[in-house]
């Protein structure tokens, strides 16, 4: 085979190989270091499942634990009573309470502030997992909190 023809065949093989890899599921290209969020939730909570789908879509790997004693999970994570919601997650040493948007979690992991975690208290309409078709989203704060229970506004939506 001539040198120019050999180069053409090699280029064609490279294109076919690249195209075949591109057909794989997006998960095949997810970085190995994508953060794992461990989510503790009630087995019957539907909005928690929607929030899990939201953070998965944002690229997080999610480990879901259905538990019946959420009070103990929240206490162990250091979530103050005033900041509590329906589910509690742990990611890279931080507690994430309630329907916190994925981009705020990403910001938390990038900035790495000296706090115990962040929370969206209650279940505000329009927060991830709490969307209601035809209803305007509520304004809400994402709070930061420390191990002593002190809270502050981390960001607002």
Over which residues does each language-model region extend?
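Conserved helix-turn-beta segment immediately C-terminal to the redox Cys motif
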Residues: 52-72
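N-terminal secretory signal peptides that target proteins for export/translocation
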Residues: 1-4
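Loop/turn elements at helix/coil->beta-strand transitions in domains of secreted/extracellular proteins
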Residues: 34, 60-61, 114-116
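Thiol/selenol-based redox catalytic cores and closely related redox-interacting motifs
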Residues: 76, 82-157
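Local sequence-structure signature of Cys/Sec-based thiol-disulfide redox active-site neighborhoods
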Residues: 31-52, 58
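Boundary at the C-terminal end of the N-terminal hydrophobic targeting segment
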Residues: 20-24
